[in-house]
């Protein structure tokens, strides 16, 4: 049996927790080699798993020479300490229901973990029971769904009722999918305006250094017209579709995408995330962080502080960990 809190946090407690988290996390900026000041950050997109456990893992597969190994928070914490990463929000990639609990157990004794974005299927008849079980834990900040499932779910009353359960518990929804994803996100945002929604990975746009596609931009504008929609600037290097650690390192290559996101979402609804360890296929953490640090620093200290931490707290409302 797992020991879990027995009550759902209410709105007042969640707001207080978010405020407390920010107060606890905002520490002095770190000055790294070269005299660069790094803003306190929450990396809102990481994956952890252990293929050596008895039951194994459903993802990544054994044939993945890069990712198929034990990947745990202590490694990530050491890697990112020079960049002032204060904590992380883990996104569950496994489709196994019990892996939601595995991550909550992992987080229980590790204050570096700010929250868990779980994986449950709102189309599942058992969703309500699973949700109530995991959401008792305040570290369970929401779930992630795929665009294709959301597209079908928008026509399903029971699916939408389950999504409303997430909103009523003051949790959030990550949505992952291709460039058409923001269209369905916009529809959902209008249907459930009190649900905080986070688009993952810039809607997985192919990043080629050129002007962004009109369809993607218009879809993002449609989603961003709803104030409850955020966009995670994550998997940026993977967007280049490079897989040998050879993604471009020059900020200018990514500027058309970053400028478009900035113009569409502004300083209050863009969120920092790396997609580590998947990101190592395309680039080092140092490269990924430098690109976004350089870009958002150019927007001023207030905007950079929002991007690296404050917007994550607004979207995910992680509990204070004393």
PLM feature spans:
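Short, small-residue-enriched loops and turns at beta-alpha junctions
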Residues: 95-96, 123-124, 149-153, 205-208, ...
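Mid-to-C-terminal alpha-helical segments outside catalytic/metal-binding sites
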Residues: 2-26, 34-44, 67-87, 259-260, ...
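Short helix-capping segments at alpha-helix termini
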Residues: 109-112, 138, 191-196, 226-227, ...
């Amino acid at each position: 049996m797992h020991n879990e809190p027995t009550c759902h946090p209410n709105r007042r407690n969640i707001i207080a927790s978010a405020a407390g988290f920010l107060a606890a996390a905002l520490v002095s900026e770190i000055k790294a080699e070269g005299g660069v000041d790094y803003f306190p950050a929450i990396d809102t997109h990481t994956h952890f798993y252990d293929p050596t456990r008895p039951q194994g893992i459903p993802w990544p597969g054994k044939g993945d020479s890069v990712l198929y190994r034990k990947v745990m928070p202590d490694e990530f914490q050491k890697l990112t300490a020079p960049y002032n990463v204060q904590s992380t929000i883990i996104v569950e990639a496994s489709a196994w229901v019990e892996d939601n609990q595995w991550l909550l157990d992992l987080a229980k004794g590790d204050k570096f973990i700010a929250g868990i974005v779980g994986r449950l299927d709102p189309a599942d008849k058992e969703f309500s029971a699973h949700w109530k079980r995991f959401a008792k834990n305040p570290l369970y900040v929401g779930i992630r769904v795929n665009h294709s499932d959301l597209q079908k779910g928008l026509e399903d009353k029971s699916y939408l009722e389950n999504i409303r359960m997430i909103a009523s518990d003051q949790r959030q929804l990550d949505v992952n999918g291709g460039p058409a994803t923001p269209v369905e996100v916009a529809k959902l945002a209008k249907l459930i305006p009190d649900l905080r929604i986070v688009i993952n990975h810039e809607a997985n746009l192919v990043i080629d250094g050129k002007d962004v596609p009109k369809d993607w931009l218009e879809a993002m504008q449609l989603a961003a017209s709803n104030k409850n929609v955020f966009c995670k600037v994550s998997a940026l290097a993977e967007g280049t579709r490079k897989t040998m650690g050879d993604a471009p390192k020059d900020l200018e290559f990514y500027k058309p995408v970053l400028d478009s996101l900035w113009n569409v979402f502004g300083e209050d609804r863009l969120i920092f995330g790396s997609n580590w360890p998947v990101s190592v296929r395309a680039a080092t953490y140092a490269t990924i962080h430098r690109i976004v640090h350089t870009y958002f620093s150019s927007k001023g200290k207030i905007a950079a502080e929002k991007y690296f931490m404050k917007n994550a707290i607004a979207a995910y409302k992680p509990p204070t960990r004393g």
